[in-house]
From Swiss-Prot:
Gene3D superfamilies: 3.30.420.40. The keyword ATP-binding applies. Pathway: Cofactor biosynthesis; coenzyme A biosynthesis; CoA from (R)-pantothenate: step 1/5. It is found in: Cytoplasm. This is Type III pantothenate kinase. Substrate binds at residues 91, 98-101, 172. It comes from the Bacteria.
Length: 243
């Protein structure tokens, strides 16, 4: 029997075996939580313990937990705490801090260096962690994908997808891609500058999330870590009391 990690996001459901204090090979359902009910039972693993993180709607989270409870002896759902694995969250009310951001910080803290953690999903999240595991707070904005969708919803003639980044675009699709990606990059760069001023040292830049690959060419020196949240969930799992 084995232990598994499950990450239910707003757009994707990912899972991987727990291997030491990290995630093993990751599997993903790109269609997200809504498609879980249509998956055949053998699509999900079974084992001893399931460690679960979810930022999805309560109804979808409940549906996932129902399936996992049929396949695992124990199911543990992560909640953000003020301190875990040497990481101390800056929020006065840690329960208000998103569990995906919390787990990303747990994974990032393993390197024991200042780091700016950037998540690019439905939202763009930016969090600063120092070398001692102290979280210094962060920012939340719309991701480029969400910006495009919002513009299209208000002005249907503006395409929700397509286009390539250009510093000065000469067509609408490219201008939209450039503006939305550029806005995200500008916020990340501003955060990195302010982090340097605060800590006295430039933090490394760690990027994760489904929208991250589109931004990586615009962020020289950044590291892309697609399994960051699952790796953080693994660290959370191994720091739980036995039993």
């Amino acid at each position: 029997m084995s232990d598994w990690l499950f990450d239910l996001g707003n757009s994707r459901f990912k899972f991987a075996p727990l291997q030491g204090d990290r995630a093993g090979d990751v599997q993903a359902w790109a269609h997200g939580a809504e498609g879980m009910a249509g998956q055949p039972p053998h699509s999900l693993p079974s084992g001893t313990t399931a460690f679960v993180a979810s930022v999805a709607a309560p109804s979808l989270t409940s549906a996932m937990l129902d399936q996992l409870q049929r396949r695992f002896e124990h199911v543990h759902v992560v909640r953000t705490s003020a301190e875990c694995a040497g990481v101390r969250i800056a929020y006065a009310k840690p329960e208000k801090f998103g569990v995906d951001r919390f787990l990303a910080l747990l994974a990032a803290a393993k390197a024991q260096r200042p780091v700016l953690v950037v998540g690019v999903g439905t939202a763009l999240t930016i969090d600063l962690l120092d070398a001692n595991g102290q979280h210094h707070g962060g920012r939340i904005s719309a991701s480029p994908t969400t910006m495009r969708e919002a513009l299209h919803a208000r002005a249907v003639q503006l395409p929700a997808t397509g286009g390539d980044y250009s510093e000065f675009a000469n067509d609408t699709a490219d201008a939209l891609a450039s503006g939305c990606d550029g806005a995200a990059v500008a916020l990340i760069e501003r955060s990195a500058q302010q982090a340097h001023a605060l800590l006295g040292v430039a933090p490394s830049l760690l990027v994760h999330g489904g929208g991250a690959p589109a931004l990586m060419p615009l962020l020289p020196g950044a590291d892309y870590h697609p399994s960051l949240v699952l790796d953080g969930l693994a660290r959370w799992a191994v720091h739980q009391p036995a039993g």
